[in-house]
Amino acid sequence: MMTTTTTTTTTNNSFSSAHAANATTVNKRFSAESSSPVSLYKWTDRQCLTMELWNNRMMSLIQRIINQAELVAKSKCDVGSVEFKQLKDLMNQVRAKDLNYNGSKAFEQLGYIESDMKHAPCLYTEVYRNERMNVCIFCVPNGREIPLHDHPYMCGIMKIIEGKALVEAYSHATLPPPNIVDGVPVEVIVHPPLQLTCEDQPGVFTPYERNFHRVTSVGDYTSFFDVLIPPYNKTNRQCHYFSVKNVDSSDTGVQKCSLLPSLSSDYYCDDYDLKDKPTTSRI
């Protein structure tokens, strides 16, 4: 165990060096428009959560998170920057009660029944969205998962706010990351799975490291607060789903495998709005 840990650290250092060497190339493909920090008072009707839902503390925290995410977007999502560290620190403060979020109540309102597979495998609540970011909440019922997927040329921070989640993550084995083509395997590095609760630090992924992950509810349902920079779109940042193929442990102790992408998926979430009647849409 100790030998594997030491070797993995060395490999990750090499990987980080390759990451730095290729950052300029990848950033040319990574679009995050510059903008001045947004104001909470300029939220439009398309936001799911209205200001009446927030107490004074939460208004301040949410506004700071959105403003900080704007600064991170301007820095092309440099995870080594002071701006990104400050965003992660702010995210670590968020709790379910701060968001007025209760997954159990959400499932009750939607008529979810435990172990009933006819319902969507996940709830989605949009908190804030523009062309540079998506701030949202995901809630995964007991025994369900968000399947293995990617975040093309995106970075993100996820903070567990209810329950416990098993997060299985993979990093690109080559840089710059290849384009995803249906049926063409992607070589990745396997990371040890993590179990996260609201007491843990937020999980982080970048365009290069831990960019693929699967999130599974452990025990009861789990909810997490998510910031994606920039958000998915229908042109160059579509979400792809994957299956794991050909896991291989090398002599160095580093596990690699192939992920087989599928551009089509019937996975979907139920939209859950904290104020209005929930609607259903597919993503």
Spans of features found by a protein language model:
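Jelly-roll (double-stranded beta-helix
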Residues: M1-I283
